[in-house]
Amino acid sequence: MLEEYYENNLWEDYVKLYESFWIDSEYQKILLNSLNNKIDIAKVIYGILEKDSHRWIEKIIPTLGNIRPIDCIDDEILSKRLKTMLTRMSR
């Protein structure tokens, strides 16, 4: 079940996998701003989706309960749901 959120230290380890993709490009700065400066989530989304990141965060995702990833950012439960989904995605 998607609601089974991983411990925070596991999420932090997952974020580290994508840090090398983050170079503070203009595209990445815009993505980060769109995600309310949630750098961890931005790094993972960019690491997985690269130039499709902006389109993806605005897309309705069935796995998230038919909401957009961008709508999960400021809600604790939805943010955990998004993080869990991201850990199940691959590059």
Per-range role (PLM):
Residues 1-91:
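Non-transmembrane "mature" sequence context
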